[in-house]
Amino acid sequence: YEMAHGVLPPGTVNPDGPIVSEPDGYHMSWTVQLLPYLDQTPLFLAVDFSKGAYDQSEEITEASMSVLICPSYPAPTGAVSYAGCHGGTEVQIAEDNEGVFYLNSRVRYRDIPDGSTNTIFFGEKVWSSAELNWLSGTRTSLRNTGHEPNQLPSIRDSREKLYQSNQTPDGMSDPAVVGGFGSWHFGGAQFALGDGSVRFLSENIDKLVYESLGKRADGTLPVDF
């Protein structure tokens, strides 16, 4: 995508902010933009871009793509296991949070002075029934490193039993909260960095180092993580 467009895909496309996790708005996520590069061109062509993320056909909103689902978790139809990194602190998606993906973002590799090796692009997240469909450029497809991996109590507990229909991760009942990364793996979660490498980061990672990895230009380069 970057080679074809000269920029990384926007975290979410919408006329303006704020962006909250409610089914109201255009809210087209980075996942939609990347479909042709994930061997999903027919699905990409089926999306009606004159309509928003919540006005697509059921065939589209409930599509399941194995490339976007963690093999360790049998996610329901229309769900995704991975989120783009919005930044290093818990702020609104409409703000440039020094991450790579945010509202109408057009980040180039030269806009990542910390280096792609030291910048998180994507990470795992724990799905909950409070999330919107996979096209939604909200916390469904964007998270931040302001919370250490797996550190929300409900994420830790959910690894012992799957979410019930009325359970949501801590704070996720607030549509303004973006939230952090997490996984069904004990000990941490998988992350894709800007250089194409994938790293398993411990849930005990140093908080400041982890926050720095979520930022593309804070000038703090982690020596080891």
PLM features: what roles do these ranges have?
Residues 1-225:
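Surface-exposed loop/linker segments characteristic of extracytoplasmic
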